[in-house]
């Protein structure tokens, strides 16, 4: 028996994977702005563009009209999942507001800072929907393809609203997916943003053949950078040793399905950033938000040498091996 109505906004790899999981238990509607993609999904029961080879559940429905999708998740016992990238979150919030169809409860799954404003996702939502309160972030170590295949995964929903946490738990906590709850929205979002930048660093190190010792050092010292920035922005230190901090960092920094790690590997091989991004075909949020992370860190007086090295390679033309050498030349310090 289908137990609740859920609308998923965004039919990329992650939105499709989450919708596939939800549709096993719930009346789930997957929205995409591209009507041709919606028709293709309905006809093939497969998202060949973003998640090829994964059969989608027969009960999953598809929609190209945003108002219809939002109407599906209006009730107090429903849930809306925003699966757009950070760059599209603000526009979707405005569209919900302008349509006067803001869902009672919604969560977003994007990770990063808005490039031009340096806002975290919850700050964008608060600016666009100031009269709404029941929302939060769903995050954690997860690759879309594995979720779509029904492999085990653990995620965290963080929200100031108990009702939002309860709705999200009721929607997602079944099968091979385990959901934890909390209220440290800032900590969860900072972890999700910074780990993408750090994954580029580990990709560079692995691509240069620097070994597993170097990878371990980058992950642990990167975690220290993440925690320092997160605490400076109002997050709690313990959040960064959990799923959305250390867990997500380990996965993104070491997993072969990681787009950000792939960017680092290819930079180490001598490819230009423009060529890498053109060939990737998907979002690499670490590239998008690296400047914002470093800018905020400098503004707050937070030392983030690994992030600085990544930005030097991405944007200043510094050779990957020279950036690593710069890190090794840093003065010794207490841990």
From Swiss-Prot:
It is an enzyme of class 1 (oxidoreductase). It comes from the Bacteria. Catalyzes the reduction of the glycolytic intermediate dihydroxyacetone phosphate (DHAP) to sn-glycerol 3-phosphate (G3P), the key precursor for phospholipid synthesis. The keyword NAD applies. Pathway: Membrane lipid metabolism; glycerophospholipid metabolism. Belongs to the NAD-dependent glycerol-3-phosphate dehydrogenase family. Its EC number is 1.1.1.94. Sn-glycerol 3-phosphate binds at residues 111, 140, 142, 195, 248, 258-260. SUPFAM superfamilies: 6-phosphogluconate dehydrogenase C-terminal domain-like (SSF48179), NAD(P)-binding Rossmann-fold domains (SSF51735). NADPH binds at residues 14, 33, 111, 144, 259, 283, 285. GO terms for molecular function: glycerol-3-phosphate dehydrogenase [NAD(P)+] activity; NAD binding. GO terms for cellular component: cytosol. It holds the Pfam family NAD_Gly3P_dh_N. It catalyses: sn-glycerol 3-phosphate + NAD(+) = dihydroxyacetone phosphate + NADH + H(+); sn-glycerol 3-phosphate + NADP(+) = dihydroxyacetone phosphate + NADPH + H(+). It is found in: Cytoplasm. Its main location: cytoplasm. GO terms for biological process: carbohydrate metabolic process; glycerol-3-phosphate biosynthetic process; glycerol-3-phosphate catabolic process; glycerophospholipid metabolic process; phospholipid biosynthetic process. Keywords: Cytoplasm, Lipid biosynthesis, Lipid metabolism, NAD, NADP, Nucleotide-binding, Oxidoreductase, Phospholipid biosynthesis, Phospholipid metabolism. The active site is at 195 (proton acceptor). This is Glycerol-3-phosphate dehydrogenase [NAD(P)+].
